[in-house]
Amino acid sequence: MATSAQTLRRKRRYTEEDLKRLPRDGYKYELVNGRIRQAPTDGRHGEIGAGLAARLWNQVRRWAKVYDSSTGFRMHSGNIRSPDVSVLCRERLEGGKSPEDFINGAPDLAVEIISPSERPAEIYAKLGEYFESGAQEVWLIFPERRQAHRYTPSLQVQVLGEGDVLRTPLLPDFELPLTELFEEIQY
């Protein structure tokens, strides 16, 4: 019998196994400090994530894997995080293949698309966990502001606006004008 999200809400402390038993129902789930968090996303969020994942995949598919928000990463803290888009170098995967289980550690690049309802404390807690677990870079995408914030492990941030081009030393050939990322999205 499948475990429902409703049933899990009644428990006090959840485990990785509880998270694995959740149905694939279109929601994004994370295990954070023993609690399961559900974060449904809207169409604009999904469109930006899919567009960014496609652009990244076209650039890195020969030497890295690109994942969507349904992929769980096991942080050093024990939390399971699911970035909206992530890139992981194949050399970090056994045989260069994705495991059937959650992936140990953070992706090399984690991308979070930020909704207006997300609290800054939650956003920066995630940011810290990604870097503590091995991320090389984190991008926070703010669709309503039409901005991207590119963070490095030293927590230096580069704030980019609609007229700017998103680039990273992690992906030397990757360039994404933010105008293209946001062009179809109406607010």
Name the predicted role of every residue range.
Residues M1-Y187:
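Gly/Pro/Ser/Thr-rich low-complexity, intrinsically disordered segments predominantly at protein N-termini
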